[in-house]
Amino acid sequence: MITTRFAPSPTGFLHVGGVRTALFSWLYAKNNNGKFILRIEDTDLERSTQEAVDAILDGMSWLGLKNDGEIYYQTKRFDRYKEVIQELIADGKAYYCSCSKERLEELREYQQANNLKTGYDGKCRDANYIPQQGESYVVRFKNPQDGVVSWDDAVKGRISISNHELDDMIIQRADGSPTYNFCVVVDDIDMAITHIIRGDDHVNNTPKQINIYKALNANVPIFAHVPMILGPDGAKLSKRHGAVNVMQYREDGYLPQAILNYLVRLGWSHGDQEIFSIEEMIKAFNLEHINASPSRFDFEKLKWLNKHYIKESKFDDIQTEVEYHFAKTGLDISNGPDLKELVAVMAEKVDTLVELAEKSSYFYSDDISYDENAVKKHIKASTGEIFVKLLENFEALDAQQWQDPDVLHNIVSTTAEQCQVGMGKVGMPLRVAITGSGQSPDIGITLKLLGKNKVVARLTKALEELCK
């Protein structure tokens, strides 16, 4: 069975680059009716935090990238790593090393001074050293000294590294903890991982890991090293370009559907298609069409996609996110129009859900403030008479008539005729009075969504405060 994994280290937030790797791994597993494993690589005890673990799990959950089976934690597998280390020592494929930090530092300085390749010189490799109680030691892997490590990378093609370039790396530290390059191999073997899709910053780790697979007589997985994501300026994507923490995108009003759609096309192509449902992503995804060159993050394109999903999604699919952002503003959504109806009206005018909540606040809050420029531009000496006439005409409407935007629009038009002024001389002051600004959806729709009671109350207030 095809089995992939996403194996983040909980030393910070869930980065968009990590999300893309997780997405590619998840899609490849789903495309092949396989399994997607989530593994938390928390062996760095000093830097790993529970807060970071929670951020990873929250991000994966928000995006809908559900793992199959349990979540694995490396810190819960230390006994297994020690067991395998002892097997390697017993088989003569690993050894105890007693070299002190001082000796290794002197060795490194000597190598640098003489333009030699830096790395461990193998002093303890064949010394048959057995540590005594109280002695400090590490365990090193006996890397092959001859030959070449080669693999056919699913993204980068054939890659070969001479074993002469690799030294005997430490697989168990002096404090007894196992090291990253060793743990991941044991994990991938035990979890039957068949395909490893990860960032190309791991390419240099791959030959070391392949040698451990072979030493353990295990099948070597297929590797697919995905290029990094660059900022718009071509530099590595970082905080200075904008949000890189995926949950910050939620706070900024982006939908998970938009994030996934954007990231799947960032370095992977399927003809000219830009919009993908999750089902379409799963059906179309393959490793062959991952681009070997880095991709630049385009924030404007992400915003365009987000707008598309706000406009085109079924309300049920985005309701949780819409309600989340309205809750953040403190607005009482029971004091206004149905959110489903509101989104249908406002979607064309916003790029994010933050904008949606902000630009719709006047529908739910009775405490509206007037935009000074809009008041100055649209409220004139004659506006009071217009408001009086509007109130008279609105009061005459029954509840059923108030549900028809066309009827309401006609009332505004009729009022303009009665006052012998143009439509704009009525519609724009009315907008300012009931929304606080000169911008809103179609006036008939705005009136309907606000409801008769709010409109009458706000017109009355505006008449008293703005038309003195």
From Swiss-Prot:
Gene label: gltX
GO BP annotations, alphabetical order: glutamyl-tRNA aminoacylation
SUPFAM superfamilies, alphabetized: An anticodon-binding domain of class I aminoacyl-tRNA synthetases, Nucleotidylyl transferase
'KMSKS' region, short sequence motif: residues: 236-240
UniProt cross-references to Pfam families, sorted A to Z: Anticodon_2 (PF19269), tRNA-synt_1c (PF00749)
Function: Catalyzes the attachment of glutamate to tRNA(Glu) in a two-step reaction: glutamate is first activated by ATP to form Glu-AMP and then transferred to the acceptor end of tRNA(Glu).
Full protein name: Glutamate--tRNA ligase
UniProt subunit comment: Monomer.
Keyword annotations from UniProtKB, A to Z: Aminoacyl-tRNA synthetase, ATP-binding, Cytoplasm, Ligase, Metal-binding, Nucleotide-binding, Protein biosynthesis, Zinc
Family: Belongs to the class-I aminoacyl-tRNA synthetase family. Glutamate--tRNA ligase type 1 subfamily.
Binding sites annotated in the UniProt record for Zn(2+): 97, 99, 124, 126
Signal peptide (from-to): none
Motif 'HIGH' region: positions: 8-18
CDD domains: GluRS_core (cd00808)
Entry GO MF terms: ATP binding; glutamate-tRNA ligase activity; tRNA binding; zinc ion binding
Cell compartments where the protein resides: Cytoplasm
Assigned EC number: 6.1.1.17
Enzymatic class: ligase
Record: residues binding ATP: 239
Listed cofactors: Zn(2+)
